[in-house]
A protein has these predicted regions:
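Secretory targeting and sorting signals
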Residues: 1-53
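Acidic, metal/ion-coordinating pockets
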Residues: 2, 53, 69-389, 438-445, ...
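C-terminal region of N-terminal signal peptides and the immediate post-cleavage residues
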Residues: 43-71
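Feature captures C-terminal
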Residues: 74-79, 83, 89, 99, ...
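Short, solvent-exposed aromatic-acidic interface loops
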Residues: 382-395, 551-554
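Glycine-rich phosphate/diphosphate-binding loops and the adjacent beta-loop-alpha structural elements
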Residues: 413-432
Length: 623
């Protein structure tokens, strides 16, 4: 399959005919209740008027394996274009975040610059040409953890961009809840921000596409807070979409963001609504799942099935895929920011397409679903799929260029301010990263300003969204770190909090990196200068953190002593599975984490004496 995959068809059970039709969404049809009426689930669950985008969409790609050419009248090829984890990256991402790895015929790899919605729009519009039956869908995390251009304005620019891209439907992801369900309601429905007001004279109209959240329930009513599914229809062709986010969303989002919500099992939820769609006569179904896996190769065009069908991928999506009913024809996934096109067997033992398009708009997936008008089902033997690179060698879409320029005009006075200087790229890759060390040091320095007794700082790796790039992104000059670049690194506006812990609790926190909910996928905290220990990956569970090796400024941690620890507010609430961090005492809440980083860079660097990348040698890793 490099870049493409096909697999055989296995028919589903018969369904009842459908009657509902979709017209293009109007502003009067609001999918999600406003903040004041969040609990009014009946309104949230109201059917959304719908009508597929009828744009004369088209291809422009080399065909993959499988059903080719013009199908007989019985069959209709439906193009499904999909992407995931955009995270508000409207401008081309910089550094490694703006590149993909491509496997060459001789086994070598090369990197390709990719991403930017001006280019994504051009690629999608070109792909749609000649395909009158075309759907564009997404797998969640369209917003949240966004660069300044979008994040400064609560991601209104990204919603506007997705409207221009003619996105038809998306699942929610965990980052859609960063600012809570009320803010998600506003992004869906429109309206000015309740605190910051309107950014433009015309106001904000909200998303033209539905967000789906079948497994996100209002705890009071037990019903989904958003539409659980949506059906695309055109000339008798009907394809249903069910959207879910990962069940573990509350573990990786601030408690305030998911207050009053319950997140249910992904596969069980999809299976439930597949039956609902079956009763409506919808036999062709695609699941949009904001959960993913880890392919065996980082190359976007790696043949995931080369070791054997489904053998080239691991992670949560494998178990989910094996438990999602055979009624579902394809799975569009995300969350792990990986690229893959894999076949994973459904519960009946039949292969089914599972795809993901990396992140940040660097790729999109082009899937062909061949619809059998006689059965109303997808002929799985004809399903083909390929990840396509959003290269930057095509013309920019003028409407997206105008959109970016308009929002940049508003953001520039804040974003262009220099906050520091670096001598080289400072990456956020690896178990311990140079940038992770820098941020932890910044939080320790800020903590000492609040309380001179502060001993150490801990930073969650998921809160570091990008590296710092030496090369200038604009006119600021090489080595200059702007506020916008800092915002891209730390966009969540978490506060820096101080808490007291016993030495025994500090040891327990370090062990929670590799045990409990983090046992299968460790979350290695970034640590401040002076804290050292050994991580032995040849062992299992909590034993991977070697207790006797844990030292602060060269001295062993005293289990009975009290240590003052700086963390961000997400960790201080026990996020990412660090339950012990939620048990601290003597809380002191400081400024936001980006301000702490900016102050540290300003105080410790200049054009003549830039900061060098830290050595990232505080954790000794045994493999």
């Amino acid at each position: 399959m490099p870049a493409t995959s096909t697999h055989p068809h296995h028919p589903h059970q018969p369904h009842q005919p459908a009657t509902a039709r979709r017209a293009r969404r109007t502003r009067g049809a609001r999918l999600f209740a406003t903040a004041a009426a969040l609990a009014t689930v009946a309104a949230l669950s109201a059917a959304l008027p719908a009508n597929a985008h009828d744009n004369g969409h088209g291809g422009g790609h080399a065909p993959g394996k499988g059903h080719g050419g013009h199908a007989p009248a019985r069959y209709q090829d439906v193009q499904l274009l999909s992407f995931n984890d955009l995270h508000g990256n409207l401008e081309p991402p910089s550094g490694s975040s703006g590149r993909v790895t491509e496997l060459q015929a001789d086994g070598t790899t090369k990197t390709v610059d990719a991403g930017g919605v001006e280019y994504l729009a051009t690629h999608l519009r070109e792909a749609r040409k000649g395909h009158p039956y075309s759907i564009t869908a997404a797998g969640g995390d369209m917003v949240g953890a966004s660069p300044l251009l979008s994040g400064l304005f609560h991601d209104e620019p990204t919603i506007e961009a997705l409207n221009e891209l003619k996105l038809d439907v998306t699942s929610v992801g965990n980052h859609e809840f960063d600012e809570g369900a009320r803010e998600l309601a506003r992004l869906q429905n429109g309206g000015c921000h309740p605190t910051d007001g309107c950014y433009t004279p015309d106001g904000f109209e909200g998303a033209d596409f539905p967000y789906l959240a079948a497994n996100v329930l209002d705890e009071k009513t037990g019903k989904p807070i958003l539409k659980p599914y949506w059906v695309w229809k055109k000339n008798g062709v009907k394809i249903g979409f069910i959207g879910v986010t990962l069940e573990g969303t509350p573990n990786i989002v601030s408690a305030d963001g998911v207050k009053g919500l319950a997140f249910k099992d992904e596969a069980e939820t999809i299976n439930k609504y597949a039956k609902v769609l079956e009763k409506q006569g919808v036999k062709s179904i695609v699941a949009l799942i904001h959960e993913g896996g880890q392919p065996a190769s980082a190359s976007y065009n790696y043949d995931c099935d080369s070791p054997g069908a489904g053998d080239g991928i691991s992670g949560p999506i494998v178990d989910i895929a094996k438990n999602v009913t055979p009624q579902v024809d394809a799975l569009v996934t995300g969350h792990t920011h990986q690229a893959y096109v894999c076949s994973i067997d459904d519960p009946a033992g039949n292969p089914r397409m599972v795809t993901s398009a990396a992140s940040f708009g660097r790729l999109y997936t082009d899937t062909t679903l061949t619809y059998d008008r006689r059965t109303g089902d997808i002929a799985r033997t004809a399903v083909k799929s390929a990840n396509r690179v959003v290269t930057r060698d095509v013309p920019k879409a003028a409407d997206l260029t105008e959109l970016i320029a308009r929002w940049n005009t508003l953001a520039a006075p804040i974003g262009n301010r220099a906050i520091g200087y670096i001598s080289a790229d400072i990456d956020n890759t690896g178990s311990e990263s140079p940038l992770g060390d820098l941020i932890a040091d910044a939080q320790l320095a800020y903590g000492k300003e609040l309380d001179p007794e502060t001993d150490l700082a801990l930073m969650n790796p998921g809160g570091i969204r990008a590296g710092l790039t030496y090369a200038a992104k604009g006119a600021e000059g090489d080595g200059v770190v702007t506020y916008a670049e800092g915002f891209t690194v730390q966009p969540f506006a978490n506060t820096v909090n101080l808490q007291d812990f016993t030495g025994a609790q500090v040891v327990q926190v370090l062990k929670e990196q590799v045990s409990g909910s983090n046992a299968a996928s460790p979350k290695i905290l970034q640590i401040s200068s002076g804290l050292t220990y050994t991580l032995d990956l040849t062992k299992s569970g909590a034993d991977r953190v070697v207790t006797d090796s844990i030292k602060l400024n060269g001295a062993p941690i005293d289990p009975a002593a009290t240590y003052r620890v700086a963390t961000n507010s997400f960790l201080a609430g026990g996020g990412d599975g660090f339950t012990t961090l939620g048990l601290g005492t003597g809380d002191l809440v400081g400024t936001d984490d980006l301000t702490a980083l900016a102050e540290y860079l300003t105080a410790n660097s200049s054009a003549a004496a830039p900061i060098a990348p830290p050595a990232a040698n505080r954790i000794t890793i045994v493999q």
